[in-house]
C-alpha cells in the first residue's frame, strides 16, 4: 500500500496508528493504547463501536444471506424508515458510499433538468467524484474574481472538459450567489450543497437566510437543489433540513444510515426520483451495482437508525453543547485565540481570530501561527488519550458526560503543553 494505508486523510508521521479493537466510545490501537473516539469512522458510527443491537442483527443476517442479486426485505424497511423520517424524501435508491450517492444524484438532476452543468460552493466537499472535488482546497493564486471563481482540479489528470461543467459560488453571499446562478441559468441543472456549509471539519457554517435564498433561486430557475446530508443528517431526527425547515429536491445520505457498514442513498420527490423508474420502459437514469442494497448494510442501517429516536438526538445535542462549552472554557483559561462551533453532535475547534463566513475568509485566517497551534493540538491529542481528526469532534450515543469532561481536560492539557513550547 502506498504510504502504508488506504486513506490519505489519516496521514501521520512517522506512520499511522493502526486500530486493533474498539467498544463503545473507546478505541485501542495495535500498541495497546486506548483513547476516546471522537472520529467514529468519519461520523458513520453514531452509536459508537460494537453497538450490541447492531452486532447481533449483523451476525444473524450473515448466517442467512450476505448478498444476492435479488432485493431483500431489509432494503424496503430502511427505505420506509428514511421516507417517514425525512420530509423532502418520497422515494429512495441505495448505493455503497456518499461519493457514489452524490455521483448518482448529479446524474438524476441532469436527466430531470435537461442541463449538464453543476454548481457548488467554492471550498465545498462532496466526496471523490472528480467533478465535485474540484476547488475543494484552492489557493488564492487560483481563485479568480469572487463573482466568477475559477474551477481548479483537486487531482492531477482531471480533464479540463470536466472542469468546464462546474460552476462555483461563495458561501453566505446571497447577491453574488444569485447573480452567478442567474448568469448560468441555461446550463446549470443541479446545485449541490451541504446545508451545514463547507462541511468536513471546516467549521464554516451556512447562514439560514443563505440556504433559504438558495432554495428560492434554484426553484425559480428550474435547477434541482441537492442537499448533501452524508455528514449533516446526524444533526437532527430529520437531518439538517428538518432543523431549518428548508426542503431540497434531492438528498444524498451515507455514513450513519449504514450502522457502520458501507452505504449511500439518494432520496427525493416522486417527480425527480421518477428518472430511475422502469414502469414506463427504459429509465432516463440506469442505476445498479453489485453490492447496492445488500442485506448486511440494510439490516445494520435499519437497526442503527431505529435506535436514533428524537430523545437520542436530544441527548446528542446536549452532549455537543457540553463539549462546546467546555472547549470554549479551555480556550479562555489557556489564553488561546479561537472559536468553538457546534451543530448537534459535531463540534469544531478553530484557531482563528474571527468566525469565517466562507472559504476565502477561512483561508486567510489560517495564519502560520494559527496553523502551527492547530497542528500542535492535533499532534498532542493522541498522547492525551483522544482520537480526533482535524480538531473536529464527532459524537456518539456511547459517549457519556464523564467522557466529555475527560476530553475537555485532555484538550486543556494539550493547550497548556503548547504554551510551554511543546508540540509546536
Each language-model region and where it sits:
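Conserved N-terminal phosphate-binding loop of PLP-dependent enzymes in the Aspartate aminotransferase
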Residues: 1-424
Amino acid at each position: 500500500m502506498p504510504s502504508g494505508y488506504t486513506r490519505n486523510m489519516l496521514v501521520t508521521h512517522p506512520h499511522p496508528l493502526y486500530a486493533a479493537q474498539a467498544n463503545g466510545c473507546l478505541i485501542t490501537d495495535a500498541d495497546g493504547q486506548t483513547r476516546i473516539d471522537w472520529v467514529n469512522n468519519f461520523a458513520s458510527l453514531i452509536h459508537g463501536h460494537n453497538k450490541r443491537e447492531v452486532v447481533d442483527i449483523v451476525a444473524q443476517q450473515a448466517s442467512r444471506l450476505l448478498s444476492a442479486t435479488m432485493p431483500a426485505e431489509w432494503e424496503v424497511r430502511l427505505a420506509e424508515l428514511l421516507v417517514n423520517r425525512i420530509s423532502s424524501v418520497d422515494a429512495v435508491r441505495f448505493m455503497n458510499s456518499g461519493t457514489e450517492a452524490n455521483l448518482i444524484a448529479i446524474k438524476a438532476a441532469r436527466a430531470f433538468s435537461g442541463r449538464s452543468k453543476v454548481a457548488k460552493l467554492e471550498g465545498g466537499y462532496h466526496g471523490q467524484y472528480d467533478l465535485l472535488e474540484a476547488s475543494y482546497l484552492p489557493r488564492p493564486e487560483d481563485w479568480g474574481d469572487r463573482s466568477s471563481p475559477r474551477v481548479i482540479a483537486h487531482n492531477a489528470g482531471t480533464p479540463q472538459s470536466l472542469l468546464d461543467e462546474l460552476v462555483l459560488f461563495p458561501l453566505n453571499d446571497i447577491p453574488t450567489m444569485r447573480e452567478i446562478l442567474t448568469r448560468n441559468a441555461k446550463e446549470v441543472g443541479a446545485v449541490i450543497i451541504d446545508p451545514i456549509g463547507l462541511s468536513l471539519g471546516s467549521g464554516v457554517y451556512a447562514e439560514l437566510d443563505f440556504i433559504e435564498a438558495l432554495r428560492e433561486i434554484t426553484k425559480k430557475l428550474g435547477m434541482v437543489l441537492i442537499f448533501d446530508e452524508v455528514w449533516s443528517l446526524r444533526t437532527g431526527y430529520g437531518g439538517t433540513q428538518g432543523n431549518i425547515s428548508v426542503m431540497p429536491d434531492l438528498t444524498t445520505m451515507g455514513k450513519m444510515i449504514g450502522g457502520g457498514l458501507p452505504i449511500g442513498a439518494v432520496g427525493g420527490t416522486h417527480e425527480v426520483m421518477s428518472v430511475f423508474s422502469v414502469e414506463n420502459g427504459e429509465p432516463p437514469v440506469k442505476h445498479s451495482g453489485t453490492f447496492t442494497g445488500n442485506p448486511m448494510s440494510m439490516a445494520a442501517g435499519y437497526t442503527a437508525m431505529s435506535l436514533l429516536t428524537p430523545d437520542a438526538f436530544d441527548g446528542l445535542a446536549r452532549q455537543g453543547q457540553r463539549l462546546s462549552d467546555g472547549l470554549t472554557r479551555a480556550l479562555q483559561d489557556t489564553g488561546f485565540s479561537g472559536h468553538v462551533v457546534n451543530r448537534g453532535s459535531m463540534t469544531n475547534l478553530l484557531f482563528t481570530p474571527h468566525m469565517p463566513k466562507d472559504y476565502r475568509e477561512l483561508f486567510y485566517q489560517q495564519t502560520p501561527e494559527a496553523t502551527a497551534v492547530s497542528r500542535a493540538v492535533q499532534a498532542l491529542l493522541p498522547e492525551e488519550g483522544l482520537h480526533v481528526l482535524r480538531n473536529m469532534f464527532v459524537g456518539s450515543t456511547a459517549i457519556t458526560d464523564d467522557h466529555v469532561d475527560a476530553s475537555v481536560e485532555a484538550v486543556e492539557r494539550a493547550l497548556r503543553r503548547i504554551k510551554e513550547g511543546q508540540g509546536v
